[in-house]
Amino acid sequence: MKRHVSLSDILTGNKRKVRRQDALQITIDDENDTESGTFDARTAKHDDSSVIFLNHSVVKPIEAVSTNHKSAKEFLMTKRTKEKCDDDDDDLIVISDKSPKSETNCSKIALSQEHEDDISIISTSRIKSSLLNERASKIKNFLKHETTDTFKRLNSISKLNEIEPPLPLHQSIFPVGDKELSDRSVDIPLPFRTIPPLNHNFLPSDYESLKDKNSASCIPVRYQAPVLLGTNIKRNTTLTWPQLFKPVTLKQVLIEPKLKLRIKNWIETSFHTLEKPTLRNRLLNRINPNKQQGSGDELANFIVPDLEEDENLRPDFYRNGEANSSLSEFVPLMILHGNSIGKKTLIQTIMREIAGDDNSYQIYEVNSNMNRSKKDLLDILLDFTTTHYVKDSSKRKSDYGLVLFNDVDVLFKEHDRGYWAMISKLCEFSRRPLVLTCKDLSLVPSELIALASEQNSLFHTKKISTSTVYAFLTKYLKSLEIEVCDDWLRDVVKQNNADIRKCLMHLQFWCVDTEADLISSKNRLPVLTSTLGSSVKDISQLTDLLSINDVIGQATLNRSMVRQEIDSTTMTPEKVNTFQDQNLDDEMKLKFDYVIDYKLHLNDPNRQPLLPFELNIYQHIQEQLEARYSYVREANHRLDNEYLVNRFKKMTESTLNFLASRIPKYDHLQSARRTRNSKKISDILNQFKGIYNDETLNENAEIDLLSATTQQIKAEINPFVFEIAKSDANVKNENKQIFELHSENVSERRYKDLVYQLSQEGVLKNVWFNADPSIVVRKWEHLHSGFSKNK
């Protein structure tokens, strides 16, 4: 058995493994023992390293070759010094640089009898130095073969021979001894400029608001406590007032009367239409056009839903599979959008009036506070919309039922997954009406909006005016035998943004307690004697103050001192990036769920809007300016008059209709000269009779007007359109007079030829609007007459 040991192991008696593979090793052959007292040293090649094999046995002394008897220690001490080597590994037995044959015949080392355990060791620095020289030569040869193109200078600073040192960060030169550095002042000349003198001429009346705090500050007005005229049972109920005064009839719902009747008629018509099978081709062409028109893929419709296999649920085919051409086209979908309050109450009231009894109808309501995913609701809603609900089998009544989807514009990414796909599937198979309510119509799929618009089932509910809400609240309080201050009641309506439910809760909080003392407080504007003069200086001073106050208002608008909590359901970039992680499990997705929106919300804690109870210095200064310059307050008071607001709305509607009737370019009377257009000539004749064609209106006019503010419409658009309407009215009157002058001796049958001849000769002037301009003129005069009455 052979073992590999090092020379240090032999000298020290330790047996350990060799650390390096390229080190010289000694092999001891235990099986083939040599003669006692000798070392049989032989070499062998293992890979690239030389190994010495020593046949070790009991070492016996041999005859000395030299007469000088030296021990191993003395031999090493008299050996000349070799070059130092960087490597400090274990000593190795020197192998001669001669031929391999000489390496196998190793000389025997004589040992003296006095030192039997000593072995002559020769330093291996020569071998190590030769190995290092060979390695260095290989590196040099490798570098010679490498081209200089492989090494590129990464920076221009490597080409410089010298680099200037950077400026020291600290002072490196100090004065010698006790001398201190003397400071020297240097004058730097600046360009000469003159500063105009600031001469402000202030009047004592300008500081009246600071001298007299009682007249300038806001005086709290204490309203009277609610007067309870009697003991009313309704006041002691446990119900909230919105539930107590819930509308019972359709007339009590605070929505536009004409719109309520249109919605009721559509729901009634849908119930009668759905009693028979109907076609849904409009829907199928929009959500799945390949299914109706054919697809290039033969296996596009290979997987067929179970509902399509049931012939009873397919409304557009007979049971034998043949198409029914006599069926009507109808999809039971209605979209109710807008900022009005009470959409759900409106549907419930209409269903109660249609059914005639609370037990004869059923509304399946889907709210935003529940999981509205496709897997949670599709099967339940399909069962409800494709089967009849029978409450009492003995009395089989024709029950009425519909599905009401509330707040469809508020959708969560994970909780409401597959929501719109579920609604599309219900529209395809439902035998009951589907009603969708929302505020923002832009978050509803365009396919459903276009489908509802084609069927005249897209309804917009407008916000109710404050006067209507005030009248209803007065009626409710009167039924409860409660009297309140009218000014305070108007403030309640304005504070709650004309929301009837919030107003009722506000009133219940203050009026239900018989011991209520303080209702509210109001800021009374200071009454000052100074008014705005007619001089340019006064007007300039007012405009400067208003401009400065606007700057203050913009600077303090988003500077709230109250730190508000950030809504965890808001769609932020952090939430979107979190959902892009593929390793996110379903539980974490539900935890970090957010509302789907068409824009990302950036939460800036340093830009929070002012709360209603925080100090608004901009509003305070504005009130002071309005109190000082009375004309501003009078103008605002005139504009706040609801009677004038209604007139302004009518004026704006007439302006919009007039602009929408704009004749396209190259489509006026000049085109009639080249070709005889009977329809255009007929329109001209009708205009002479006072009949105007408003069928072809430009829809872009309303979109362009949406970007304008109310102030721009009042000050710029309406006056400008009024001047255009006056000019257009004069042109049409002149054309009418010219036509009447030339048609005295012409029969009525030849009126078209006469108009064509006059247009070719250029006698008739061009008109640019099809609408009646006199309507705009009348609305403008009606509006200004209202201003003159309120002065």
Swiss-Prot record:
GO terms for cellular component: chromosome, telomeric region; cytoplasm; Elg1 RFC-like complex; mitochondrion; nucleus. The modification Phosphoserine is found at residue 6. Its main location: nucleus. Keywords: Cell cycle, Chromosome, Nucleus, Phosphoprotein, Telomere. It is found in: Nucleus; Chromosome, Telomere. It comes from the Eukaryota. GO terms for biological process: DNA replication; DNA-templated DNA replication; double-strand break repair via homologous recombination; heterochromatin formation; mitotic sister chromatid cohesion; transposable element silencing. GO terms for molecular function: chromatin binding; DNA binding. Disulfide bonds: none annotated. Component of the ELG1-RFC complex which consists of ELG1, RFC2, RFC3, RFC4 and RFC5. Involved in the negative control of telomere length and in telomeric silencing through a replication-mediated pathway. May have a role in Okazaki fragment maturation. Required for S-phase progression. Component of the RFC-like ELG1-RFC complex which appears to have a role in DNA replication, replication fork re-start, recombination and repair. Belongs to the ELG1 family. This is Telomere length regulation protein ELG1.
